Every structure is written in structure tokens, then in C-alpha cells.
Regions:
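Helix-to-loop junction immediately C-terminal to a conserved catalytic motif
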Residues: 52
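Conserved ABC nucleotide-binding domain
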Residues: 129-145
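Conserved ABC transporter NBD signature motif
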Residues: 60-70, 76-80
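Conserved small/polar residues in nucleotide/adenosyl-binding loops
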Residues: 173-179
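The feature captures the beta-strand-to-loop junction immediately N-terminal to the Walker
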Residues: 37-39
Length: 183
């Protein structure tokens, strides 16, 4: 087994005549933190979107847990454990912390034909998981729109980790996360 969780081998991505990525090679170990720095238009977001299954590379290969992978959709990336938190966070301001945390993957209770959303369990999990990364959510039914930008980004990160992200690509953390936050 390789020491690397993710490997990009000579990845290139083109949009018409625009070269977005050219021969990018990088390796990421389990537990490693990597920061991509570059000017606007340097390809950082394209690289993240390629890892997340939004874009298919035109050249090169992606190796994840020693297997060559080809994503047909972002769902494929999620299914193997690649989570992504984008700058816009994909949160709904008018919905609660709990609803945003589970969005489409709500815990259920009841009989097989009569299942309902287990709000008590969901509230408990959302509050606990947010607490684990230093965000005190006194009322998980509060609207996400009442939270700061950093708290919202922590919610999106916490959600990705809870649902099994082995790799977490986070775009523009410096815009909203406090510098003393540990995840």
C-alpha cells in the first residue's frame, strides 16, 4: 500500500484553447495539509474541482488509495470519501443548522413504510459535531443566516467530515475562518 492517499500524475485540463492545468503532479499523504497558493486564474479552483469530480482531466491520471479513478460526477468523489467545501458553502440561509447539516441525508425513525425525520437525533448530532470543532450551537434549529461566515464554513467542514470525507478540499478558508480554529 502506498504512503499516499491521493496522487495527481501529469494532470492537464483545457477549456477550448485555455490551458487551465498543465502537467500537474502532486501527492498527498493521509493526515497531511496542503495549501495551494497562486494568482487569480492560476488553476487552484480547477484543480479542486478536478479532485471533486466536477471536471474530468483531459490528460493524466488521479490515483486514490492506490486505485486509478475516473469520476463521472461529483457524487462519485463523495462516495469514495472526497469532500469539498467551496467558497459559497452550499448552505441555505433560511434553513436551520440541523437541516443544513443533513440536507438530503436525514436520520429517520419509525416503521419502514412510515419513516419520519428524527429531529431530536439530528439536532444532537449537529450540535455535538459543531462543538467538536469549537462552535457552540445552543439552538440547532436556528437559521444558518444568523451565523457568522466562519461558523458557516465550520458547519460545511463538519458536515463533510461527519459524512466520511477522507480528503477535504476547502476553497478560500482565509475569507471566513478565524486563524486560531483547529479542525
Amino acid at each position: 500500500m502506498s504512503e499516499y492517499l491521493v496522487q495527481f500524475n501529469n494532470i492537464s485540463k483545457f477549456f477550448g484553447k485555455v490551458i487551465a492545468l498543465k502537467d500537474v503532479t502532486m501527492k498527498l499523504k493521509r493526515g497531511e495539509i496542503m495549501c495551494l497558493l497562486g494568482d487569480n486564474g492560476a488553476g487552484k479552483s480547477t484543480l479542486i474541482k478536478t479532485l471533486a469530480g466536477v471536471h474530468k482531466p483531459d490528460e493524466g491520471e488521479i490515483i486514490f488509495e492506490d486505485k486509478k479513478i475516473i469520476f463521472d460526477s461529483p457524487r462519485d468523489a463523495l462516495d469514495i470519501g472526497i469532500g469539498t467545501v467551496y467558497q459559497d458553502l452550499a448552505l441555505v440561509s433560511l434553513m436551520s443548522v440541523t437541516r443544513n447539516f443533513f440536507m438530503g441525508r436525514e436520520p429517520q425513525k419509525g416503521l419502514p413504510l412510515f419513516k419520519t425525520f428524527d429531529i431530536e437525533k439530528a439536532n444532537k448530532i449537529a450540535a455535538e459535531r459543531m462543538g467538536q470543532i469549537g462552535i457552540d450551537v445552543r439552538d440547532p434549529s436556528q437559521a444558518v443566516g444568523t451565523m457568522s461566515g466562519g461558523e458557516r464554513q465550520c458547519l460545511a467542514i463538519s458536515r463533510a467530515i461527519y459524512f466520511g470525507a477522507k480528503v477535504l478540499a476547502v476553497s478560500y478558508t482565509h475569507l471566513t475562518l478565524p486563524t486560531n480554529r483547529e479542525v
